[in-house]
């Protein structure tokens, strides 16, 4: 009897640790943003093209970095998240992903979850998304328009991070 009880406890502990270890970050949570850092830095369109175009070095008041803030419109109580991009070694490198840390973002983008999912799958890009107000945008529009390829890659990045879409945080 003791042996059966011990085996049951061990199997519960193993299954519990596996379920927590395999969990996906909630979409656009601070944990998701941390995973997005790697996705950004592994995308040559984002890292190389945004540096080549001058986007990464065109920073507010010469502060040396860009901040992109994003959130889910249909999750009003969830935190906004930020990605911090710096020019390093000829690339636009994402050095931070997580909770809002800078009160003056360069860009703020928001959309409903189903729209983020569609953009992450490449069902449509930034032009269609903004034209039909599927993606709301605050920031230097002209700068974004000059970087449509990387802007499209950024929207696709939202689909590259394995995510839990079932809750808001």
Model-derived features: positions:
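Feature captures hydrophobic
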Residues: 20-169
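Bacterial N-terminal signal peptides
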Residues: 7-15
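Positively charged n-region of N-terminal signal peptides that target proteins for export
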Residues: 1-4
């Amino acid at each position: 009897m003791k042996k059966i009880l011990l085996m049951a406890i061990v199997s519960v502990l193993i299954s519990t640790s596996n379920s927590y270890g395999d969990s996906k970050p909630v979409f656009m949570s601070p944990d998701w943003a941390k995973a997005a850092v790697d996705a950004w830095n592994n995308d040559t369109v984002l890292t190389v093209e945004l540096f080549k175009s001058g986007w990464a070095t065109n920073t507010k008041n010469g502060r040396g970095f860009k901040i992109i803030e994003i959130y889910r419109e249909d999750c009003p109580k969830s935190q906004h998240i930020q990605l911090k991009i710096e020019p390093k070694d000829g690339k636009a490198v994402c050095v931070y992903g997580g909770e809002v840390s800078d009160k003056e973002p360069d860009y703020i983008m928001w959309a409903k979850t189903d729209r983020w999912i569609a953009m992450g799958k490449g069902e449509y890009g930034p032009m269609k998304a903004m034209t039909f107000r599927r993606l709301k945008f605050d920031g230097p529009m002209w700068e974004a328009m000059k970087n449509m390829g990387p802007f499209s890659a950024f929207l696709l990045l939202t689909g590259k991070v394995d995510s839990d879409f079932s809750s808001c945080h």
